[in-house]
Amino acid sequence: MSSQLNDPTPIPAQSSLSFTQGFLLGQLSVVLLIAAFIKFFIFGEAPPPPSRGLSHRSATHRRSNSIYSSTQHDGNTRTLREKPSNSNVLRPVPSSATNTRSILRKTYYTAIPTNPSSKHGRHRIHHSSHQPESLDWFNVLIAQTIAQYRQTAYLLKDSPTSSILSSLTAALNNPEKKPSFIDKITVTDISLGEEFPIFSNCRIIAVDDPNSDGGRLQALMDVDLSDDNLSIAIETQLLLNYPKPCSAILPVALSISVVRFSGTLCISLVPASTPPLDTPSHSPSPPTAQTTTTGRSKREDQTGGSHSRAGGSSEEPSGENPPKTSPKSNVAFSFLPDYRLDLSVRSLIGSRSRLQDVPKVAQLVEARVHAWFEERVVEPRVQVVGLPDLWPRMGRTGVRTGDDSETGSNAPRSSTAADASGPAHHEDSSREPEVLRFGSLLGTRPPFDLASRTSSFNVETGDLRSRSMTREESSGNLSDQFHMPGSLPGGGVTTT
């Protein structure tokens, strides 16, 4: 009995084994939970966001885009290991990308057709129910641009070839446009004005156009300009060449001022795939988008070819292998026929016994100016301007003056910034007049008034001009390569 009581009781080993198993099982479950969280919550694919207009989209609209959707789905499911061919790198653009309805829907703009019938053979216009815009910000940008052009013209007033005086003189005396009974035309006064055009009431309309899918969009905006200081004055002589050349000479002095201009400006985009615009056959057709681009490319090719031949380049001549130019988009602008252009024409005819402000001369000049304007920028005629290349390039990169950052100090400055800041240090600000005027004094020809022999005339008031700048006539080094678009049709004073 005593031996049985003294024997120690053996401790079971199952308790320590069960604790180890439970600890390992708990660690394994935690690892599995972390792995599942990382796999399904972090690396899992997010569901596609619902479309904004999915609830309002009909079944027929979804089926109409099935072709493009299948193409896009095939492109998205393409693995990274598959190397696409060179022709399939750029994804296809849907056929409705340039549709006016699609553009208006994506930009949240409404254009509701209110006049279904066409009038006078013109395209049907769909007026917009969107509220018109004031364009105050656009007026500020346009005013800054015009002010910069005026300042640039003033800084280049002494240049023999780049000044506005020499350019206008070369344009007015173009031998191909000027008739033989008009002597050399001399510009005696130029005023670039001091006011700016005001744009307002901008609205977008949809116009039916068979050349584009779904028509095209036009921006209509009202323009108003009232500036009495926007004028030009010239002097010339009418020659009587019968029975012999220069049998009689009649001095003529004219001044034209734009009192007020108001109208509706139409701006639209002309895609590169659109055929050239049609123009009436009774007048010279303005340059279309294709002809403008082709002419510009030909001039660039000729200039580039001459430089390459002068530099001894090993490239082939441009005539054998002409470079291919890609089509270019353009912007077309015009004015509606209900414009208003008020002019003030002053005239002085004769040398000894003078006729001042002849009404018939004023009527003829106003008729010529209106005809010149209507043949170029009044509907159905439009002016086509190519869109510039807006791709960022290092050659056009500039740094704003006054920035002290390290990047700005090390970055190269463009030539435009250097040219704009260069003349400002050499030009005295006190010499700038309130109204930019340029004049040239003619000592051999009498001015408007006998008391103003030593100064150029001011046709707006008829008396001496106090604020205008006068300078001697240029030495005649006019640029032969200058070309100004537009001209006064027929006889009389013509422009290039």
Curated annotation (Swiss-Prot):
Cross-referenced Pfam families: MMM1
Record field: compositional bias (Basic and acidic residues): 75-84, 424-433, 462-474
A single GO cellular-component term on record: endoplasmic reticulum membrane
UniProt region (Disordered), positions on chain: 50-96, 276-331, 395-433, 449-496
Keyword Membrane: yes
Cited PANTHER family: TEX2 PROTEIN-RELATED
Function: Component of the ERMES/MDM complex, which serves as a molecular tether to connect the endoplasmic reticulum (ER) and mitochondria. Components of this complex are involved in the control of mitochondrial shape and protein biogenesis, and function in nonvesicular lipid trafficking between the ER and mitochondria. The mdm12-mmm1 subcomplex functions in the major beta-barrel assembly pathway that is responsible for biogenesis of all outer membrane beta-barrel proteins, and acts in a late step after the SAM complex.
Domain comment as written in the entry: The SMP-LTD domain is a barrel-like domain that can bind various types of glycerophospholipids in its interior and mediate their transfer between two adjacent bilayers.
Protein name: Maintenance of mitochondrial morphology protein 1
